[in-house]
Amino acid sequence: MEKINEYGSERIVSPERTGYDSYSLRPKFLSEYIGQENIKERLKLAIQASKMRGEQLDHILLAGPPGLGKTTLATIIANELNANIHVTSGPILEKQGDLAAILTNLEAGDVLFIDEIHRMNRNVEEILYSAMEDFQVDIMIGKGPAARSIRVELQPFTLIGATTRSGLLTSPLRNRFGMIFEMNFYTQEELKMIITRAAEVMGTLIDDDAALSIAKRSRGTPRIAIRLLKRVRDLSTVRGSENITLNIVEEVMRLLGVDEFGLDEMDRKILKTIIEIYKGGPVGLKSLAASLGITEDTISEVYEPFLVQSGFIARGARGRIATEKAYKYLGYNTLPGGLFDGFGNIE
């Protein structure tokens, strides 16, 4: 049968947010949030302590690959604090005035969430320094020789920043966060629980083996798990099935081109390129991106994290290397050092 993907050019297993992702399935409180146990425990303690002291919660940085629940966790923190949350993102804050307008309109106890904070303009970022430390901001009034700076006192607030590339944050900004959490990929058991809960919220029953099959293909990412569940539910509905079965899951995955490892055609293309064109590597990011016809950021932020985490690619000082697992996955023969002639034969 022909493979289908109703997302058009968007990958069904992309961890990036799409217009098809549903906010209604997200947990609202820490008690409903599955996974990231260490982070949850630390947050519970910090939130409880801030409430008992009547103080503002420390600023928080949430770091990790896309789709792991950074936005969801920021919303949960606001809910736990019974606070209003204001959402923006680094790329749209182009001028200092854009951020100053948001900061001066915050009320006491509010939460400001800045997604992709690493992409914020450096001039804009400087306004955050005094805002985070002293709850005040200097605003320039007028232009030219008549311009003057006035200091505006801000209401106490909590800033939550989210980043997929914490290494791009400047030290002055990073050092102003009281708590920094590195979010990890989810286990299959955690994803199975997330899928089962989401199916229940959707009003759908799902067999345990079916939920586990989806979890195995979800690349350690809840956003992908929910997206796959929705597509499986579609076929289940069309078939008139009372619950989602393993057979239905496997049929949908074949149609979507997602294998039992959660890899799709682009993942396989990346691995084949490293092995066939670059003899298994090492290959630099720039060269790999040029060969694949995609941007370096797309490789490093979207594809690589899972391929590295799952052991198909290793990264070193000289570049990316296809692992023995990648060779075996694609059915290639290898020598120590990864020599390969492109046709499954050893050179």
Swiss-Prot record:
Region (Small ATPAse domain (RuvB-S)) residue ranges read 187-257
Role of this protein? The RuvA-RuvB-RuvC complex processes Holliday junction (HJ) DNA during genetic recombination and DNA repair, while the RuvA-RuvB complex plays an important role in the rescue of blocked DNA replication forks via replication fork reversal (RFR). RuvA specifically binds to HJ cruciform DNA, conferring on it an open structure. The RuvB hexamer acts as an ATP-dependent pump, pulling dsDNA into and through the RuvAB complex. RuvB forms 2 homohexamers on either side of HJ DNA bound by 1 or 2 RuvA tetramers; 4 subunits per hexamer contact DNA at a time.
Record-level GO cellular component terms: cytoplasm; Holliday junction resolvase complex
Top-rank EC class of the record's enzyme: hydrolase
What positions does the entry give for ATP binding? L25, R26, G67, K70, T71, T72, E133, D134, F135, R176, Y186, R223
Cross-referenced NCBIfam families: PRK00080.1, ruvB
Q: What protein family does this chain belong to?
A: Belongs to the RuvB family.
Self-association state and partner proteins as the record states? Homohexamer. Forms an RuvA(8)-RuvB(12)-Holliday junction (HJ) complex. HJ DNA is sandwiched between 2 RuvA tetramers; dsDNA enters through RuvA and exits via RuvB. An RuvB hexamer assembles on each DNA strand where it exits the tetramer. Each RuvB hexamer is contacted by two RuvA subunits (via domain III) on 2 adjacent RuvB subunits; this complex drives branch migration. In the full resolvosome a probable DNA-RuvA(4)-RuvB(12)-RuvC(2) complex forms which resolves the HJ.
Quick one: where's region Head domain (RuvB-H)?
260-347
The identity of this protein, by name, is: Holliday junction branch migration complex subunit RuvB
PANTHER family, per the entry: HOLLIDAY JUNCTION BRANCH MIGRATION COMPLEX SUBUNIT RUVB (PTHR42848:SF1), PTHR42848
Per UniProt, the keywords (alphabetical) are:
ATP-binding, Cytoplasm, DNA damage, DNA recombination, DNA repair, DNA-binding, Hydrolase, Nucleotide-binding
Cite the binding residues for Mg(2+).
T71
Where in the cell is the protein located?
Answer: Cytoplasm
Listed Gene3D superfamilies? 1.10.8.60, P-loop containing nucleotide triphosphate hydrolases, Winged helix-like DNA-binding domain superfamily/Winged helix DNA-binding domain
Swiss-Prot/TrEMBL catalytic activity: ATP + H2O = ADP + phosphate + H(+)
From the broadest rank down, the organism's phylogenetic lineage runs: Bacteria, Thermotogati, Thermotogota, Thermotogae, Thermotogales
Enzyme Commission number(s) of this protein: 3.6.4.-
Q: Where is this region: Large ATPase domain (RuvB-L)?
A: 4-186
Q: What is known of its domains?
A: Has 3 domains, the large (RuvB-L) and small ATPase (RuvB-S) domains and the C-terminal head (RuvB-H) domain. The head domain binds DNA, while the ATPase domains jointly bind ATP, ADP or are empty depending on the state of the subunit in the translocation cycle. During a single DNA translocation step the structure of each domain remains the same, but their relative positions change.
Species source reads Fervidobacterium nodosum (strain ATCC 35602 / DSM 5306 / Rt17-B1)
Listed GO MF terms: ATP binding; ATP hydrolysis activity; four-way junction DNA binding; four-way junction helicase activity
Q: Which GO terms describe its biological process?
A: DNA recombination; DNA repair
Which residues are noted in the entry as DNA-binding? R315, R320
InterPro entries to which the protein is assigned, alphabetical? AAA+_ATPase, AAA_lid_4, DNA_helicase_Holl-junc_RuvB, P-loop_NTPase, RuvB-like_N, RuvB_C, WH-like_DNA-bd_sf, WH_DNA-bd_sf
